Curated annotation (Swiss-Prot):
GO cellular component terms given for this protein: cytosol
Domain Helicase ATP-binding: 40-220
Record domain Helicase C-terminal: where: 231-391
Organism of this sequence: Xylella fastidiosa (strain Temecula1 / ATCC 700964)
Enzyme Commission code: 3.6.4.13
Subunit field text: Component of the RNA degradosome, which is a multiprotein complex involved in RNA processing and mRNA degradation.
Protein name: ATP-dependent RNA helicase RhlB
Region Disordered, residue ranges: 424-454
Gene Ontology molecular function terms on file: ATP binding; ATP hydrolysis activity; RNA binding; RNA helicase activity
CDD domains in alphabetical order: DEADc, SF2_C_DEAD
Gene from which this protein is expressed: rhlB
HAMAP family: DEAD_helicase_RhlB
GO biological process: RNA catabolic process
Sequence motif: DEAD box, positions: 166-169
Length: 543
C-alpha cells in the first residue's frame, strides 16, 4: 500500500463499456489505485494475471471492473443454459465473499447482470434455487460451490469465460487447495478462458498453482516501501499474563469513541476478553468460528454502523474484511504466523487513512516477535507498562446496545476447554459436572435474584462402585481438576475436599462418604481415583 493510494490515472482513460463507466462514477470511483493502474491495461486486453497487493489497496475493484466489462462488451453463448454462469469469483472466507458481492452490486447492480452469492452457513435450498434460475456471475466459497457442482443439474462451469481467485495464499492456509484444483479442472481449457489470481504474497506454491492452471500469466506486483504501510503506527507492550486485561482496559479508556478490533489467538479465550470488555461498559461483538453465520453478518453490520465499539475476533476475520474507519487494532495475543500479523494490522490504515496497531507480547506468545520483526523488516517500538496505564480512566454510563447480549455464542466445547484451563491454573470457573469421566458445563443459578453473574461450583462425581454397598455413593469435591495419586503430596490448591453428610439429613438410602470411608469399604477405590486422575490429566493435556 502506498502513502498515496490514488494515482493520476482516471478510469475514463480505459476503453470501458459506457454503462460500466457510468456506474463507477455514480459509486464515487474516478481515480485508480496503484494495483488497479497495473492490472487494468493487462487484464482488459484478455491476459491472465497473477497480482500481488496488500489488503486495502483496491484489488477487489480491479478484478470486478475486468469481469463486468468483459460480460457487458461481449455477448454470451446463444445456447447457454441457466445453470451456466459466465464468470466465477472464488474467495476463501464467507466474509470476503459477501464483501465482494456488495462491492459488485454497488456499481454493477443496475447493468443487467445477475450476481449470485454462494457460501455455507445459510439456507442451502434457497441458494440452489438461485443457481437454477441462472446467474451471470457466481461469487462463492469453495466448499459450498463444490456441493452444488456435484449435483450436476444445479450449476456447471463448462462455459465460464473468466475466473478470479482472490486471496490465493489464504486458500492454501485454510486447506482449500484440493477444492480449488477440483473446481479449476471443471472450467474450460485455460487457453479459452481468462484467469485472474490475486494474493497478498506470491509464494512458490501460489505461483506453482498459477503456472499449472493459467495461460502464461503476467506477474504484477504493487510495489510498497514496506510490508506494512507506514501509516500504521505500531507499538508493543510486554505485560505479564495477569496484566493484559487491565492494560487493554486502560488503553481503551484513553481512546474513547474509536472503532477498535481486538485479536485473540484462540476462540477459547475470545469470550473471556469480550466479557471483560462488556462488563467494563463497552458495546462488544465477538467474531469467531463458533458464531453462527447470520449472527456474524449482523455483528459486522452493526460494527460497520458504529453500533458496536469493539469487535473481538480470531484470525477468521483477519483477512478480506473491508470495514471502514477502524482506528485501532489490538493484538491481545501475538500471532504465531508473521503473515497473520500483517493481515491483522491491515484492518486499519486502509486506503491512505491513519491507524494504530498495539500488540501485547506476554510470556506465552513473545517467542513470535523476532519472526514478525524479521518479516516486516523493522523493529516495533516498545512502550512501557506503567501503573497509570493499568488503571482505566472513568467512563460515562453505558448506553444500551438495543439488541441484547453481543458477546456471542461460544460452543459448549470451547467453554469446557476454558474451564479446564482455568481449573489447571487453580481458578475454578463455571459448574461442570462429571459423568463417566467427562467434564461438562452446567448452567448455574443466580444467587442475587437474577441481576448478577451466575455462581456455580466445579464438581466431580465418581462412578458407583459395584464393590461398595449400593446405598453408598462417594462424592468428592475437586478444586482444580487434578486428583493426586495415593501417597503423593497434594499442593496448596490441589486436593480433595472431603465432605460428609449425616444419614439424618433426610436423604433416605443415600450416604455421602469421605475418601477414607470409601477406601476402608472397598479395596478397589484407589484404582478408581487413579483412573479418574489419569482421565482428567489426559483431558487437560489435549489443550
Amino acid at each position: 500500500m502506498s502513502d498515496k493510494p490514488l494515482t493520476n490515472l482516471n478510469f475514463s482513460s480505459f476503453d470501458l463499456h459506457p454503462a460500466l463507466l457510468t456506474g463507477l462514477t455514480r459509486a464515487g470511483f474516478t481515480l485508480c489505485t496503484p494495483i488497479q493502474a497495473l492490472t487494468l491495461p493487462v487484464a482488459l486486453a484478455g491476459r491472465d494475471i497473477a497480482g500481488q497487493a496488500q489488503t486495502g489497496t483496491g484489488k477487489t475493484l480491479a478484478f470486478l471492473v475486468v469481469v463486468v466489462n468483459r460480460l457487458l462488451s461481449s455477448p454470451g453463448l446463444v445456447n447457454r443454459n441457466p445453470e451456466d454462469p459466465r464468470a466465477l469469483i472464488l474467495a476463501p472466507t464467507r466474509e470476503l465473499a459477501i464483501q465482494i458481492y456488495n462491492d459488485a452490486v454497488k456499481f454493477g447492480g443496475n447493468l443487467g447482470l445477475r450476481f449470485a452469492l454462494i457460501y455455507g452457513g445459510v439456507d442451502y435450498d434457497r441458494q440452489r434455487e438461485m443457481l437454477r434460475k441462472g446467474a451471470d456471475v457466481v461469487i462463492a466459497t469453495p466448499g459450498r460451490l463444490i456441493d452444488y457442482l456435484k449435483q450436476h443439474e444445479v450449476v456447471s462451469l463448462r462455459v465460464c469465460e473468466i475466473c478470479v481467485l482472490d486471496e490465493a495464499d489464504r486458500m492454501f492456509d485454510l486447506g482449500f487447495i484440493k477444492d480449488i484444483r477440483f473446481i479449476l479442472r471443471r472450467l474450460p481449457e485455460r487457453c479459452s478462458r481468462q484467469t485472474l489470481l490475486f494474493s497478498a504474497t506470491l509464494s512458490h506454491r501460489v505461483l506453482e498453482l498459477a503456472y499449472e492452471y493459467m495461460n502464461e500469466p503476467e506477474k504484477l506486483v504493487a510495489e510498497t516501501e514496506s510490508v506494512t504501510t507506514t501509516r500504521v503506527r505500531q507499538r508493543i507492550y510486554f505485560p505479564a499474563e495477569e496484566e493484559k486485561i487491565p492494560l487493554l482496559l486502560g488503553l481503551l479508556s484513553r481512546n474513547e469513541g474509536m472503532r477498535t478490533m481486538v485479536f485473540v489467538n484462540t476462540k477459547v479465550f475470545v469470550e473471556g476478553v469480550a466479557r471483560a470488555l462488556d462488563e467494563a461498559g463497552y458495546r462488544v461483538g465477538v467474531l469467531s468460528g463458533d458464531v453462527p453465520q447470520r449472527k456474524r453478518e449482523t455483528l459486522l453490520n452493526r460494527f460497520q454502523k458504529g453500533q458496536l465499539e469493539i469487535l473481538v475476533a480470531t484470525d477468521v476475520a483477519a483477512r478480506g474484511l473491508h470495514i471502514d474507519g477502524v482506528n485501532y487494532v489490538y493484538n491481545y495475543d501475538l500471532p504465531f504466523d508473521a503473515e497473520d500479523y500483517v493481515h491483522r494490522i491491515g484492518r486499519t490504515a486502509r486506503l491512505g487513512a491513519d491507524g494504530d496497531a498495539i500488540s501485547f507480547a506476554c510470556e506465552r506468545y513473545a517467542m513470535s516477535l523476532p519472526d514478525i520483526e524479521a518479516y516486516i523488516e523493522q523493529k516495533i517500538p516498545v512502550a512501557a507498562v506503567t501503573a497509570e496505564l493499568l488503571a482505566p480512566l472513568s467512563r460515562p454510563g453505558r448506553a444500551s446496545n438495543g439488541n441484547g447480549d453481543t458477546v456471542g455464542d461460544i460452543s459448549p466445547h470451547s467453554r469446557d476447554v476454558l474451564v479446564a484451563q482455568e481449573w489447571r491454573r487453580g481458578k475454578p470457573r463455571g459448574s461442570p459436572g462429571e459423568r463417566d469421566g467427562r467434564i461438562r458445563v452446567c448452567k448455574g443459578t443466580r444467587s442475587d435474584g437474577g441481576g448478577g453473574r451466575r455462581r456455580t461450583k466445579f464438581r466431580l462425581e465418581t462412578e458407583r462402585d459395584s464393590s461398595v454397598d449400593g446405598a453408598v455413593t462417594p462424592v468428592f469435591g475437586v478444586s482444580t481438576g487434578i486428583v493426586s495419586a495415593p501417597g503423593k503430596e497434594v499442593g496448596r490448591n490441589i486436593g480433595l475436599r472431603r465432605r460428609s453428610r449425616s444419614m439424618d439429613s433426610g436423604e433416605s438410602g443415600h450416604v455421602v462418604a469421605t475418601a477414607d470411608q470409601v477406601a476402608a469399604k472397598s479395596g478397589s477405590q484407589p484404582s478408581l481415583l487413579g483412573r479418574i486422575g489419569r482421565r482428567i490429566r489426559s483431558l487437560l493435556s489435549m489443550f
